[in-house]
């Protein structure tokens, strides 16, 4: 019998601003059985995909991406905010509702043709994961799928992803 992970996602009304229903995953992370179930679910999905790496988007993508990579026996590659990686990087700028942001990756993190899954905790508007996929394409990596614990369907992230494959364990 599989565990209902929605029981471990807490809804926080009016956080961080009035009108927002924040999905708090800390109860899931704090429960070893639930956290393991989430990682195992991803691992079963990607076990036979001939992946070279799991790529995690800063910061909560690291929480799910690193243990998934270990479970699959492959490497973990971080995509970070600007100025956080010590070696030579490539980056991509992307638009937010008010302004822009930037993601970076080490320029030697992957080889052309490497098959990867991009992991983050939540798919909202899709801007960050689209930028991450664009960054990986610059390195010549093949993004097999973008994986999320949660998708907030009402924010239109799946439309922003277009034809890029993605998967979410929980949808709201």
From Swiss-Prot:
Main localization (coarse): cytoplasm
A Pfam family assignment: Pribosyltran
Enzyme Commission number, as recorded: 2.4.2.7
GO biological process assignments: adenine salvage; AMP salvage; purine ribonucleoside salvage
Top EC class of this enzyme: transferase
Keywords for the protein's UniProt record, in alphabetical order: Cytoplasm, Glycosyltransferase, Purine salvage, Transferase
Catalytic activity: AMP + diphosphate = 5-phospho-alpha-D-ribose 1-diphosphate + adenine
InterPro entries on file: Ade_phspho_trans, PRibTrfase_dom, PRTase-like, UPRTase/APRTase
GO CC annotation terms, alphabetical: cytoplasm
Function noted in UniProt: Catalyzes a salvage reaction resulting in the formation of AMP, that is energically less costly than de novo synthesis.
Protein family according to the UniProt entry: Belongs to the purine/pyrimidine phosphoribosyltransferase family.
Subunit architecture: Homodimer.
Name of the protein: Adenine phosphoribosyltransferase
Organism: Herpetosiphon aurantiacus (strain ATCC 23779 / DSM 785 / 114-95)
